[in-house]
Amino acid sequence: MKRNTKIALVMMALSAMAMGSTSAFAHGGHGMWQQNAAPLTSEQQTAWQKIHNDFYAQSSALQQQLVTKRYEYNALLAANPPDSSKINAVAKEMENLRQSLDELRVKRDIAMAEAGIPRGAGMGMGYGGCGGGGHMGMGHW
């Protein structure tokens, strides 16, 4: 019985190690911080940082407004009875905010292309195709 228990424990440990190591092979070994990604020249790094800072400055207020509208939308849905005209109005405002954010993202992408910065390049988590979700730091292109 002891021998069977030891074998089972060893097998479980080996399985856990094997499953844990597979993430190292995902995306060609490029991890969260995009190790082994094509390096940017110092000019490209400077341009990337400026483009990123400009995008953040322009989009942060819109993102905060979107979060506020999302809370308002959820509160309106929780009301008894829900006011469909108010809910639709807030949903339309959220749609307009998302569209404005998308337009800013397109402008950012164009600026990066004009600066010769390859898609997926950048500094830090999410500025590459590492399989995250969402925008602004989560790797969606």
Swiss-Prot record:
It is found in: Periplasm. Disruption phenotype: Deletion of the gene confers increased susceptibility to five classes of antibiotics and to some environmental stresses targeting the envelope. In the absence of stress, the mutants show no default in membrane integrity or in cell morphology as compared to the wild-type cells. In the presence of drugs that target the envelope, the mutants show enhanced membrane disruption and abnormal cell shape. Deletion does not affect the minimum inhibitory concentration (MIC) of E.coli for zinc or copper. In strain TOP10, disruption mutant exhibits a higher tolerance to zinc concentrations above 0.5 mM. Its main location: periplasm. Zinc binding is required for repressor activity and enhances chaperone activity. GO terms for molecular function: cobalt ion binding; copper ion binding; identical protein binding; nickel cation binding; zinc ion binding. Residues 1-26 form the signal peptide. Belongs to the ZraP family. The N-terminal region contains the metal-binding site and the C-terminal region is involved in oligomerization. Contains two zinc-binding motifs. Binds four zinc or copper equivalents per octomer with high affinity and without change in quaternary structure. This is Signaling pathway modulator ZraP. It comes from Escherichia coli (strain K12).
